[in-house]
């Protein structure tokens, strides 16, 4: 395989670390939490966190037996947040409970569950973190209908680790965040496993997991059923002034993605993204399968990506690699633009052992005239779709690739592309 060495390096680099067991237990009820679903337990939960964090070895903050209504809480180093099975940490519906703050270099709101410059953090227990975001979704829809652009940070995110180290989420359900649900931001050594991430399929910007300028990340055995990207690897915002750090050394494996926009790299990629492995992924009814997306105002080096052992059922577009986001394919003639700091460069990408049935479109692979997609390899790929695959401004190798289209050609290659078939 072309990128065998890469796969080994990524898998080793992203292996979870083990930290010392915490020594103190802080039950939030002992600090005054009611867990009745109507009393705001924010202060009691935060006091339990702060008390455990002050202990020499940190501790376990326990929530069990009820629905704990809360505004934003802040985790501290060496804390395990244990939300027991059958227990819900529910976000306050009152927008005033979420302080405005600088979030991701811009104006925003404090996340529902957050941590900043902390390490050795675990969220586990089998319970639910519910962002209760419907009122925020409704407001966002009204703004859109009114023609208001709105900010990327105009709603609080769900669970955010900001400049943290050694983070684990295991055995949880995370759902209904106002926007982006789990976000490691400039965070190193992250494991998210055996977790469900859920939201109404029509909810705006409810990405399941967004590793943002983060490194050594494992996402495994996750079920995502949301209203936006099931996973979106990001680095840097639109028109970022820089500098931006890349997202790299990321493994996504043994996951199932239902509603949502698929497994995405981008679109915000001003810091780049490298060394990403996605394997044994099942897509059912997602808008897209594999999606690598950017454009001239948010790109950088995006390379050494491996997608293997992929199954898709009724996915609208199986493979979408485009440097024209939000468009999939340019309209009419495209002129080259000067190469700048935010020009996207997609290269060294392999898609192997992919089977897709019931797609509307097999795919698109298209780069910019000044930055074509280079060294993209499709191997052992079988796609059945209503329409075929288009390739332009790209250098591609197709090795045992079959695209069966009901309408038109299976694969259409533009004169701007170089395709080698094997």
For every predicted segment, state its role.
Residues 4-14:
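Bacterial N-terminal signal peptides
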Residues 17-422:
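Extracellular/periplasmic carbohydrate-active domains that bind, remodel
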């Amino acid at each position: 395989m072309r990128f065998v060495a890469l796969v080994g390096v990524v898998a080793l680099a992203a292996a979870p670390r083990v930290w010392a067991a915490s020594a103190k237990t802080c039950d939030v009820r002992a600090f005054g939490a009611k867990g009745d679903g109507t009393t705001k337990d924010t202060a009691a939960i935060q006091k339990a966190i702060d008390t455990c964090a002050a202990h020499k070895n940190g501790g376990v903050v326990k929530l069990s037996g009820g629905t704990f209504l809360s505004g934003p809480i802040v985790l501290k180093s060496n804390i395990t947040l244990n939300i027991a099975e059958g227990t819900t940490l529910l976000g306050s519906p009152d927008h005033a409970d979420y302080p405005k703050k600088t979030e991701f270099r811009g104006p925003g709101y404090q996340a529902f569950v957050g941590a900043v410059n902390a390490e050795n953090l675990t969220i586990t227990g089998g319970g639910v973190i519910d962002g209760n975001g419907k009122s925020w979704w409704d407001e966002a829809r009204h703004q859109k209908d009114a023609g208001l652009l709105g900010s990327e940070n105009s709603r609080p995110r769900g669970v955010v680790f900001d400049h943290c180290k050694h983070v684990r989420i295991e055995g949880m359900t995370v759902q209904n965040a106002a926007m982006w649900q789990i976000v490691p931001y400039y965070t190193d050594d992250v494991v998210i496993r055996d977790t469900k991430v859920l939201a109404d399929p029509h909810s705006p910007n409810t990405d399941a997991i967004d590793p943002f300028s983060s490194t050594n990340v494992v996402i495994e055995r996750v079920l995502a059923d949301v209203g936006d990207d099931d996973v979106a690897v990001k680095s840097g915002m639109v028109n970022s002034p820089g500098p931006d750090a890349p997202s790299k050394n990321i493994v996504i494996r043994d996951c199932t993605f239902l509603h949502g926009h698929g497994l995405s790299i981008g679109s915000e990629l001003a810091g780049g993204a490298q060394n990403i492995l996605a394997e044994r992924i099942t897509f059912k009814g997602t808008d897209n399968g594999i999606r690598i997306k950017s454009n001239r105002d948010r790109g950088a080096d995006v390379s050494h990506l491996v997608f293997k052992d992929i199954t898709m059922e009724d996915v609208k577009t199986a493979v979408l690699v485009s440097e024209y986001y939000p468009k999939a394919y340019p309209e009419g003639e495209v002129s080259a633009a000067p190469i700048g700091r935010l020009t996207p460069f997609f290269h060294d990408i392999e898609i192997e052992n992919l089977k897709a049935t019931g797609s509307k479109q097999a795919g698109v692979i298209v780069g910019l005239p000044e930055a074509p997609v280079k060294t993209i390899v499709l191997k052992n790929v079988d796609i059945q779709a209503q329409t075929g695959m288009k390739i332009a401004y790209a250098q591609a190798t197709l090795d045992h690739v079959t695209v069966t289209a009901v309408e038109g050609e299976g694969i259409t290659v533009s004169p701007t592309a170089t395709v080698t078939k094997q």
